[in-house]
Amino acid sequence: MLGFLAANAQVPTPDQFLGYPLGTQFTPHYRVVDYFKQVAATAKNVKLEQYGATYEGRPLLMAIVGSPENMARIEEIRQHSLDMSNAKGGANGSQPVIVWLSYNVHGNEAVSTEAAMQALYELVNNGNAQTQQWLKNTVVIIDPCLNPDGRERYVNFYNNTRGVKPNVNRWSREHNEPWPGGRANHYYFDLNRDWAWQTQKESQQRVAKYNQWMPQLHVDFHEQEIEAPYYFAPAAEPFHDAITPWQRQLQVLIGRNNAKYFDQQGWLYFTKERFDLFYPSYGDTYPMYNGAIGMTYEQGGSGRAGVAVLKKDGDTLTLTDRIAHHFTTSMSTIEVASQQAEKIISEYTQYFEAAKKNPQGGYKSYVVKAGGNTEKLNSLAELLRKNNIAFGFGSNAASASGFNYFTGKTETFTIDKEDLVINAFQPHSNMLRVLFEPVSHLTDSVTYDITAWALPYAYGLTSFAVKAPLTPAADAPAVRNNTPLSAQKPYAYLAQWNSLRDVKFLSSLLQNDIKVRFTETPFSVGGKDFPAGTLIITRAGNTAKGDQFDRFITSQANQFKISLDAVASGFVDKGMDFGSDKIRFIKKPHVTLLGGRGISSLGMGEIWHFFEQQLDFPITVVDERNTDDIDWDQTDVLILPDGDYKMLADKAASDKLKEWVKNGGRLIALESAAAELAGGEWGIKLKKEEEDKEAKEKAVSTRPYEALKPYANRERESIKQFIPGAIYKVQLDTTHPLAFGYAGIYYTLKQDANLYEFMENGGWNVGVLKKDSYLSGFVGADTRQQLKDGLLFGVKEMGDGEIVILADNPLFRSFWENGKLLFSNAVFLVGQ
């Protein structure tokens, strides 16, 4: 392989260790782990660390490789890299470049791990003069598989279905994975969209380790469709303007070096197309916004390629070919890092020093108001910590003037001691800017992912972007005292309802057989106002706990950091007493979630993860093919994630589902599942755009040649209907349980043009788009015109049951924190 390979009698090659030539079959994860352990036990210049484990218990590994001299001082090298990233120490002549190679974040892009074994071997091979020379001024970290659970799902499938010889016909069984495929992790999350948000166990452990090293160069290895040539940097537009000229320049240098080796072999490749650098949570952009040179490398193949597959041009793409390509770019990248080591270290140092002394962008501070929602504020603070962003609370300035994210205006506001204050004059100000800027500038509207993600909208917290620097007054907020055990025996305990933590508290109470109620209307007692949605835990009905009732409730509150109000009477000062029918009992729901072929594994996984890992609340997952087996008498809530449903197209199955709803069931339909209901007789209709039709007809009559468009402009024309992910302002009816806990406005991440007609006759329009609801992110001209005056979130009453429509996904990638309460309302409060 391009002169990189040489014999070594000490360290076994992958072929020797595995007992088969690399590329003739896919290697299970445990054998990959065994090989890395063998190399670490044999070679003197490699250190192996297990930095974590997956949800299914598989080890997550990283191999650190360097020259013997560098390995002898590896902790000093790591610490100096960390100091540079914190603007605490400048470059020195002996600091090597840390190159981090991440393989197989998408499980069914399974060539990457095979290539990682070959790369490790050549780096520790003393007989390879090239790699040993490169290691004099580089330290290479290899993570052979970021997603072992997903990869094992694919490898097991392929090894179980292939024949004695690989079948190259792509319609054969071995080239067609069953649902959900191996791309995602155990909970079907795309780990390559989770770097910044760190919602998944694998991401949390990996990024924590990454941030202990802060490498100067990071490569994320992928695969794409079978017919695609190899892709490597430089990336496509749009580039976020936080990316520096040097970062662009080094991408070009590395790309040219990769091209040199590909040209020698006559291999096809492309650059500067398709894969942009904008969304902040990729394996290339996250390192970029943290000072490194981040790159994605994409080999043609992926889950349908198997060991060998026939391409449309008649060539056979083999696993051996794919390994060779990824191995070559791995080595080529390390080569450039070695050649440019001094410049890379110098620019890396300057990056963080400049970020601290002169932060980019017009805003120099951000203030996030607590506003009575310390739980959400604490959740945001935790995300900032995970991303090395410094912050504090309160300020010596009593007030300031800044851009209000919610009103879109510059306003004067007060700064309270509980408010979170972030000063941009810090080493990680570029990441701060990317996550907080109200509107990110797009240099090209053709992009690969969502185009808006500002955290104040994602968390639903009133925030201000300030052009002047503000210094936090304290590193931590005032300590919240635990709820004390009352000496008296209160009539009831009251708990707020406005954050995920409140839902976790409710989940725990219900599972411990505590009877909980909530109020449908506001009330006042003891001189304090309580909004609709407030949880009420009365002593009456909970006598089974006996003398332990008070101790149990307060211990639960302290576990979830919930502040309780104890009241001595059910007689309120204003509003409805606790015996009123406006005080609703919360029945512990039995929840069923559908999955299976045709249903979005991502959407289903987000819900599954939400119940199991965030709420710790039981849920039954059923394949849609097996809905006839559901015990409908034991099912209170049925959730339909985004997807296509055969049962909704089948009249008998659909009628059975309607009967269940009429008898008291609650059907929650998300995204395209809601659209499928609109296509049937469910009393829900997609919004018709008669005005747009008339406008188009008028345009044709007045401009008859309007339809004559150049073929070369077809991509630009198509994005007129495109909405990859933009933020819209939703007006809420906060008197309905679906919107309890909100202040009247919800910010949604809109990813399609679906909007529903306002409902009448037993329908409640809880969340609607009115005119001028757009806030930020790219929206095609035609789609933007459509997105007004329609329903996004609603409840349709049907007999004794309800249908909850959630046109947008409130659990998107689990980072849209403000949507979690909306979804929880649909599960726990609606219809009670």
Give short role names for the model-derived ranges.
Residues 1-13:
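Bacterial Sec-dependent N-terminal signal peptides
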Residues 152-169:
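Aromatic- and acidic-residue-enriched segments that line the glycan-binding/catalytic groove
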Residues 172-197, 218-234, 296-298:
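Core alpha/beta catalytic barrel or barrel-like domain that forms the active/cofactor pocket
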Residues 10-110, 114-138, 193, 199-201, ...:
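Intrinsic-disorder/low-complexity accessory segments
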Residues 54, 146-150, 224-226:
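Short, internal active-site loops enriched in acidic
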Residues 138-154:
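Short, conserved secondary-structure transition motifs
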Residues 102-103, 143-145, 218-221, 670:
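Active-site neighborhood of phospho(di)ester-bond hydrolases with catalytic His/Asp-centered motifs
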